[in-house]
Design a protein with these regions (language model features):
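Terminal helix/beta-alpha structural elements that buttress the NAD(P)+-binding lobe
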Residues: 2-36, 43-79, 86-377
Length: 377
């Protein structure tokens, strides 16, 4: 049961939508959904564009056109539904978060409606455009490290030494948004042997975030360098027990990782696997089943896992606490540094969305998150 919209809120609003694979984006007028029990209606001011948006707009990944896009928002609470389970949100609060389940939760629109546990209050001293670049990939890092690797990330963080502090964990594509947050999360939870693989220009920053050592994936012998660094496996474990592939590219990451992984190595791969990148002239090619990628190239006993962040809600603790409590606390405490930003300009919401898509398609961004304004205050 939903409530009626407050009289100050418009019954319809504009949203950016896909129209066909690789076709120009368009603006569509959509209904404003009143918040039901435990829900929050948010006036969206900022959003980000992610590789998933490109995969959907150019490759039609898991959607039917026309489709609303966007999974990260920063905005202001416009209306609260009844029966709020926590007394932590007020109309007018500045908030941010990660949503993905239905059109009413898509973020490339001026109003969106979601559940209370998908909402983070903006901490003092953090700009909204910074926060909008955090939740999607910070949640991805938490989900991957716990669900795919089986690592423990208890909250609150316990005092004392992490018994796996010396275990080597390779973060391949560490300069990406997911990579940045994975490195920081691992550091904060006491994993001290994080091996970051990224272009050399990012190494100094990655060490500031928590990487113990960095290697450049453009080096022809990068696999040999990583294996030399980690040395022999301990207690029957593989030399590299965990590899997080933050990119999921057949040519760009997986061929090298297949050389690195051995029996017992858990390899978590961001989905979809990019078999062929989108270009101005060619459509992308994707694969959602990691076990169909590079058949015959993986050593026997390697555990391949396709990361599906949307499943994080199956973890009841994370569902109730990750966005509503943990993410804003880590930002407020300065534990997590937001990604470096690139503000995408344009005269209209549609133009900004299209400009962001073009930047993603041309692979023109490295080590930055694309954010853009949705609506004015």
């Amino acid at each position: 049961m939903s409530t009626a919209l407050a009289p100050t809120i418009p019954p319809t609003h504009p949203a950016v939508v896909t129209t066909a694979p690789r076709a120009p984006l368009a603006t569509l007028t959509v209904p404003t959904v009143p918040p039901g029990p435990g829900q929050v209606l948010i006036h969206v001011l900022w959003t980000s564009s992610t590789p998933l948006d490109l995969h959907q707009a150019d490759g039609g990944l898991l959607i039917t056109h026309p489709a609303l896009m966007g999974s990260s928002y920063g905005g202001v609470v416009a209306q609260l539904g009844p029966e709020q389970p926590r007394d932590h949100l007020r109309v007018g609060d500045k908030v941010f978060g990660f949503t993905f389940r239905g059109d009413e939760e898509k973020c490339h629109q001026t109003y969106m409606t979601t559940d209370w546990y998908m909402v983070s209050k903006l901490p003092e001293g953090v700009r909204m455009e910074e926060a909008v670049a955090v939740s999607v990939n910070l949640v991805t890092a938490f989900h991957t490290l716990t669900a795919d690797f089986g690592l423990e990330l208890p909250w609150p963080v316990p005092a004392g030494e992490n018994r796996e502090r010396d275990t080597p964990i390779v973060v391949w594509g560490a300069a990406s948004s997911v990579g940045n947050y994975a490195v920081q999360v691992l550091r904060h939870w006491g994993f001290e042997n994080v091996v970051a693989v990224a272009r050399a220009k990012h190494h100094e920053y990655l060490k500031e975030l928590g990487a113990k050592v960095c290697f450049d994936y453009t080096d022809g012998d990068v696999v040999e360098k990583v294996l030399r660094y980690v040395g022999e496996g301990k207690e029957g474990k593989p030399r590299v027990p965990y590899v997080l592939d933050c990119i999921g590219s057949l040519e760009g990451t997986l061929k090298k990782i297949a050389e690195l992984a051995e029996r017992g190595t858990k390899v978590a791969i961001m989905l979809p696997v990019i078999v062929k990148h989108a270009t101005e002239k060619e459509a992308p090619v994707y694969e959602m089943d990691v076990n169909k990628v590079l058949p015959g190239a993986w050593k026997e006993g390697v555990e391949l896992k396709g990361t599906r962040t949307h499943f994080y809600l199956q973890n009841e603790f994370f569902k109730d606490h990750l966005q509503s409590e943990i993410v804003p606390a880590l930002l407020e405490q300065g534990v997590i540094k937001p990604n470096k930003l690139k503000i995408v300009e344009g005269k209209t919401m549609l133009e900004r969305a299209e400009n962001a898509r073009q930047l993603l398609r041309s692979q023109a961004v490295s080590g930055e998150k694309l954010v853009w304004r949705v609506a004015d205050e």
